[in-house]
């Protein structure tokens, strides 16, 4: 039988044994990829500086997902927090990767077995002797088992009853660690940034899945519903499965891009909206003002700002700054962050403090403008000499650093002031090592951006796949030329002239 590549799946339509086989092989491929990718990432990951060179700056994709579920130690002797691993045990990064590869091998062998021994008695209808699958019952079994798994994850793993818990952090991504989480059963459980909602929703959804599974195992669908939804067709199962997958892909794309308790910024990097809204900038200013109110000097106040918080307030960590087709990790763009130079404070010759207007997300270049506290432009870096009345030279702008490596230093040289004004457009100023990775200076996206882009694309593709296969299975008889009124046309006595719908209809 010569089939084109896009029709080869038809060979498993009436072959339950080999249908199981191809699903086992698919799961083997997914599991094998996950384990292999994890081992690759472990081999290239540098755990030495979790503050300025975290996993998301290095382009790690699998490691953040392992970490948020409670894996923090490596057999290599390191931990995700930069400390020395004491007792990693079997559930280390390498242990989980190995488990996935072993599972992949077992699934591969199971797939080969089911492909070879496809004609099992189990798959034959005892009444007809033909191959058949009780799809409503199989649906109930899947619901029941997935409900048990969902409940177990929420009730045991997340809560720490039997498991490590999950990654929990503060809104500013400073205190993250793996810890047990108590379920939130009130309205706060619907807060997407509340980790307690993860536990309670998995418990509730798991109970619902178990009950729904038992219902479908015990109750048979009516004949009208069975045929109306084509419950006997494997293509119906394909269509509804694709619907579940594309919906899940859309949801996780949203929680990843907009941020949630399940996508902490310490593991996946900040969101673009945290830059757009000045989220970290406001927190830094709040902390500085609080220190000043306690009597600290400007230098001391800025020195108290965690380097981690300052690094978040840098546009290069914005996932929307990297183009979709710029391959590579963030470190391949602006380089490996070495240290915070400190907060740059600009002043004109009249003593007014000036603030550099920050670059919006979707700009590659932006005019360098220095505004006073009232928002009035007092200085800039002009494009032409004819427009230079606000130039750094004429206004006499100086820059002083507080905190960081340049703490207490003041620069008045116009060329140096311009250099730091351009850097201040991008947020807090950091020194980068661009030679180690031969970084090209062009921003890249973080795993948050790649995950979102990939899942939105696949969700759209699967959405059309759902429509396609759903239409094929529901309107199969119509596509085959069998219309709804075909029985009326061929039934004797319905029309005065058999098969002629234009003739008068007999009254009954």
Swiss-Prot record:
Q: Where in the cell is it found?
A: Plastid, Chloroplast thylakoid membrane
Q: Name one GO molecular function term.
A: electron transporter, transferring electrons within the cyclic electron transport pathway of photosynthesis activity
Q: Which UniProt keywords apply?
A: Chlorophyll, Chloroplast, Chromophore, Membrane, Photosynthesis, Photosystem II, Plastid, Thylakoid, Transmembrane, Transmembrane helix
Describe how the cofactor binds.
Binds multiple chlorophylls. PSII binds additional chlorophylls, carotenoids and specific lipids.
Name the domain of life this protein comes from.
Eukaryota
What GO CC terms are in its UniProt record?
chloroplast thylakoid membrane; photosystem II
Lipid bilayer topology: Multi-pass membrane protein
Give the transmembrane ranges.
21-36, 101-115, 140-156, 203-218, 237-252, 457-472
Q: What is one process in the GO biological process aspect for this record?
A: photosynthetic electron transport in photosystem II
Which family does the record claim for this protein? Answer: Belongs to the PsbB/PsbC family. PsbB subfamily.
HAMAP family listed in its UniProt record: PSII_PsbB_CP47 (MF_01495)
NCBIfam families documented for this protein: PS_II_CP47
What is the protein's quaternary organization?
PSII is composed of 1 copy each of membrane proteins PsbA, PsbB, PsbC, PsbD, PsbE, PsbF, PsbH, PsbI, PsbJ, PsbK, PsbL, PsbM, PsbT, PsbX, PsbY, PsbZ, Psb30/Ycf12, at least 3 peripheral proteins of the oxygen-evolving complex and a large number of cofactors. It forms dimeric complexes.
Known function: One of the components of the core complex of photosystem II (PSII). It binds chlorophyll and helps catalyze the primary light-induced photochemical processes of PSII. PSII is a light-driven water:plastoquinone oxidoreductase, using light energy to abstract electrons from H(2)O, generating O(2) and a proton gradient subsequently used for ATP formation.
Name of the protein in its database record: Photosystem II CP47 reaction center protein
Origin organism lineage? Eukaryota, Viridiplantae, Chlorophyta, core chlorophytes, Chlorophyceae
């Amino acid at each position: 039988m010569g089939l084109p590549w896009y029709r080869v799946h038809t060979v498993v339509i009436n072959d339950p044994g080999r249908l199981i086989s191809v699903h086992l092989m698919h799961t083997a491929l997914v599991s094998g990829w996950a384990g292999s990718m994890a081992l690759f990432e472990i081999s290239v990951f540098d755990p030495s500086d979790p503050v300025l060179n975290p996993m998301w700056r290095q382009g790690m994709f699998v490691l953040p997902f392992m970490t948020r579920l409670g894996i923090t130690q490596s057999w290599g002797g390191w931990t995700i927090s930069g400390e020395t691993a004491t007792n990693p045990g079997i559930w280390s990064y390498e242990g989980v990767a190995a488990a996935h590869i072993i599972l992949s091998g077992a699934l591969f062998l199971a797939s080969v077995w089911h492909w070879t021994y496809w004609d099992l008695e189990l798959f034959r209808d005892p009444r007809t002797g033909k191959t058949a699958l009780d799809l409503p019952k199989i649906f109930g079994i899947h619901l029941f088992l997935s409900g048990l798994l969902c409940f177990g994850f929420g009730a045991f793993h997340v809560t720490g009853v039997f498991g490590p818990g999950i990654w929990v952090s503060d809104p500013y991504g400073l205190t993250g660690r793996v810890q047990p989480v108590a379920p939130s059963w009130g309205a706060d459980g619907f807060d997407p940034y509340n980790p307690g909602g993860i536990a309670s929703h998995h418990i509730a959804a798991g109970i619902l899945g178990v009950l729904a599974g038992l219902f479908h195992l015990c109750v048979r669908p009516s004949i009208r519903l069975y045929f109306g939804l084509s419950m006997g067709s494997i293509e119906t199962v394909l269509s509804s499965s694709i619907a579940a997958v594309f919906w899940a892909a859309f949801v996780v794309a949203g929680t990843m891009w907009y941020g949630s308790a399940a996508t902490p910024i310490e593991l996946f990097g900040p969101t673009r909206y945290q830059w757009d809204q000045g989220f970290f900038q406001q927190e830094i200013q709040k902390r500085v003002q609080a220190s000043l109110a306690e009597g600290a000097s400007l230098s001391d106040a800025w020195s108290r700002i965690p380097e981690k918080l300052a690094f978040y307030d840098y546009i290069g960590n914005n996932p929307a700054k990297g183009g979709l087709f710029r391959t590579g990790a963030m470190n391949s763009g602006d380089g490996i962050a070495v240290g915070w130079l400190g907060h740059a404070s600009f002043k004109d010759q009249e003593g007014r403090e000036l603030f550099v207007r920050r670059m919006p997300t979707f700009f590659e270049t932006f005019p360098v403008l220095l505004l006073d506290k009232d928002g009035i432009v007092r200085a800039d870096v002009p494009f032409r000499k004819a427009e230079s009345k606000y130039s750094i030279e004429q206004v006499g702008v100086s820059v002083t650093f507080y905190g960081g490596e340049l703490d207490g230093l003041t620069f008045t040289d116009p060329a140096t002031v311009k250099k730091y004004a351009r850097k201040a457009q991008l947020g807090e100023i950091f020194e980068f090592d661009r030679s180690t990775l031969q970084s090209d200076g062009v921003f890249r996206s973080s795993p948050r951006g790649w995950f979102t882009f990939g899942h939105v694309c696949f969700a759209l593709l699967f959405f059309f796949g759902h429509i396609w296969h759903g239409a094929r299975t529901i309107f199969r008889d119509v596509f085959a030329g069998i219309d709804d009124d075909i029985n009326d046309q061929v039934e004797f006595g319905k029309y005065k002239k058999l098969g002629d719908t234009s003739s008068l209809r007999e009254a009954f």
